[in-house]
Amino acid sequence: MKILVCDTSNSNCSAGVFEDGKEICYELSFETLTHSETFMPLVHRVMAKANVKHEDLDCYAVTVGPGSFTGIRIGIAAVKGMALASGKKCIAVSSTEALARSCENATMTPREETLIIPAIDARNNRVFAQAAEEDTLKPLLPENAYDADDLVSKIEKIPEIIYGKRRQILVVGSGASVMKKAFENAKSKLNIYCAPGAAIMPKGVALSAFAGKEMIDAIDLKASYCAVSQAERLKKNG
């Protein structure tokens, strides 16, 4: 199965072409322009490098959140357009799951002893995150928007942490520095390893897509924000 994978949930958008779980090519944009300006040219470059046309694809996989509200909307709209035009199905992928899957073997600690925290910076000491066993990706804290200090408190109460089954915590993603500071503020004695730049999102999206996720019609792609936007919060507060 050949898939175009896309991520616009982070500050840097990315895209790649994968076949049967193997990378053909991918690209991460470091341009300072907005996703609305960079994403589709990025897709065109990746597909040209892979020598792939839309009719050659079996489906499209895209991160649907949480993350950048505007970025998520841009990615979903673009993928919907491509899928509807080519008559292909789509796979919706969680941004935090893709982050977790993209960082396999990021440390020397055995995966069965590691708790992974994929975290996306949501500003104002907040992160979009979840906590999961690194080897199985079994969630121990659900994907949600968390205050970083509150999240540290919740992590320290996870039974697998209390009883030492998971002796290292791996924090990945743009929220890693926020979480590092929160652990320091809490004077936590847990073994923390932060890897903000370890994620290769196209790889994570592809691994999530090839993990047996359901293919859906493009029209059914929906964002998973996990929080209201700042504009909505301001409107609600008058």
Language-model segments: which ranges?
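N-terminal beta-alpha supersecondary unit
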Residues: M1-V64
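DPxDG-like acidic metal-binding loop motif
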Residues: A61-C90, S95
